[in-house]
Design a protein with these regions (language model features):
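Short loop/turn motifs enriched for small/polar and acidic residues
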Residues: 186-190
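Active-site capping/gating regions of soluble enzymes
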Residues: 1-38, 43-46, 50, 61-87, ...
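Active-site cores of enzymes that catalyze phosphoryl transfer or operate on phosphate-rich substrates
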Residues: 80, 84-165
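Conserved, mostly hydrophobic/aromatic
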Residues: 56, 185, 255
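Short, conserved phosphate-binding/catalytic loop or strand-edge motifs used
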Residues: 177-183
Length: 460
């Protein structure tokens, strides 16, 4: 698909354009193979530690119907699949009389089963003994019908996809361990903050369809790389969701979970008892930037300078875009960086004024505009800050990617230590590992002076 120039595109409203897709579908196949090979290469497999590969945001329905079989093939080594209903939801129009539509299109027995299951959960929540802040559910018939009419077409397609995943694994694996996989249901694409009632209905629907959900991802109002400002409010939101999830045996997935405060993570871990997943994909190119910024290698420094300049140019272009969303977001990114450095934020009278303000800042991977735009540099043809150059899967784009593959051992060591240190930070603050164990791990990481020593330590 890529070599034939047939990649689909993905909208990125904050940059006002579409970019050829790079992470959904068949690309999962290559990444999962790479992960398996890396474990064998480093000797990690000799430790006998179970690990999981997540096929993130696998698209259900919509324009992906025609590619479904290829998507299934791409996920056979994924032990953990996230179902993303948004492509089908985007083309679903709810009938004016949602209840009548449901009566005509949804099996009556299934609706009765779902309502009974939600009522059962609600009754258990009414009994607040042993439960933090009793949060009884209130199932409104009209709201139930509207939600069901909205999600039913996508859930039917999710069930069909799930059956195909199971069949593909049954064909290729001979053991129960190989055939098994975890399911995550992403519902943070539904409008607004997710209510406990919505979570209960979605979990009950999947349960009734024979799809055990191991993780569910509600919307908590998170923004990537930004701490949640109110820990008391966050605790309340999570407690209400956890009371429902616990009844279904599901853990909570925290999407846009990177860059939160230690206190935020402590709340997540305390409320769920460690039954959680934190999506950290927004963190990794940031940590690469920090690694190159700190490297003394001349080639690493040259890549860092080009990378930073690229984000500056996109920020300035975006700040004066005719697209309202792109302009708004670019200005938010710029003013955040300026205000955190103690600078004035009235800088949008002209592109020249904006450029002068940004260039007065010392280059840093901590600036929000760098964090938000940096991932686009990896496949920008020629490293150009132009919309036509973004997400380039031709040789020009891969020559740009090769610059990242060619970073020095010092840069690689910095990157590996940054990622590992971040994971230790998460493990400690969510309570997944004792503080003493985490402190030992941090000390060990700090002691690695060469990449070779770190890699050799993986198999020990």
């Amino acid at each position: 698909v890529m070599l034939a120039g047939k990649l689909d595109s993905v909208p990125f409203p904050f940059i006002g354009t579409n970019v050829p897709e790079g992470h959904q579908g068949q690309s999962v196949e290559g990444m999962s193979h790479g992960c398996v090979l890396s474990k064998l290469k480093t000797g990690f497999h000799t430790r006998g530690i179970a690990w999981s590969f997540n096929a993130d945001h696998q698209p259900i329905g919509g324009k992906f119907d025609s590619r479904e079989d290829a998507l299934v093939t791409g996920c056979v080594l994924a032990s953990y699949i996230t179902f993303d209903l948004s492509p089908e939801l985007a083309q679903t129009k709810v009938a004016d009389d949602a209840a009548a539509w449901c009566a005509a299109h949804v099996p009556v027995a299934l609706m009765a089963t779902v309502k009974a299951r939600v009522a059962e959960v609600g009754a258990s929540l009414d009994d607040t003994r042993g439960r933090p802040q009793g949060t009884p559910l209130h199932l409104n018939e009209a709201d139930f019908s509207k939600l069901l009419a909205y999600v039913w077409p996508s859930l039917q397609k999710m069930k069909a996809r799930d059956d195909k995943y199971a069949a593909a694994r049954a064909k290729l694996f001979t053991t129960d361990a190989g055939r098994a996989y975890l399911r995550e249901l992403s519902i943070d694409e539904l409008p607004g903050l997710t209510t406990p009632e919505t979570t209960a209905i979605m979990l009950a629907l999947c349960e009734a369809l024979g799809m055990k959900i191991h993780f569910v991802a509600p919307a908590f109002g998170f923004q990537k790389n930004m701490p949640y400002p109110d820990n008391v409010a966050l605790r309340g939101l999570i407690e209400k969701q956890w009371a429902v999830c616990k009844d279904f045996g599901a853990s909570i997935g925290f999407h846009s979970g990177s860059g939160k405060s230690a206190e935020n993570y402590q709340v997540m871990g305390e409320v769920t008892g460690g039954r959680l997943e934190i999506k950290t994909s927004g963190r990794y190119t940031y940590e690469m930037g920090r690694a190159l910024f700190a490297s003394k290698n001349p080639a690493d420094q040259a890549l860092w300078r080009d990378w930073y300049k690229f984000t500056v140019e996109l920020a300035i272009l975006g700040a004066y875009s005719a697209d309202a969303t792109e302009q708004k977001m670019a200005r938010v990114f710029v003013t955040d960086a300026l205000s955190k450095c103690g600078r004035g934020v009235d800088v949008f009278s002209s592109p020249t004024v904006t450029r002068s303000a940004i260039e007065s800042l010392a280059p840093s991977p901590e600036h929000m505009f760098w964090f938000e735009y940096n991932f686009l540099h990896v496949l920008a043809a020629g490293g150009r800050a132009e919309k036509a150059a973004l997400g380039d899967h031709t040789p020009a784009g891969y020559r740009q990617r090769a610059r990242f593959y060619a970073i020095s051992d010092e840069g690689r060591l910095n990157f590996a230590k940054n990622i590992a240190t971040y994971l230790v930070f998460l493990a400690q603050n969510t309570g997944l590992a004792p503080a003493a164990v985490c402190e030992t791990a941090r000390a060990k990481l700090a002691g690695y002076q060469t990449l070779a020593a770190l890699l050799a330590g993986i198999a020990r």
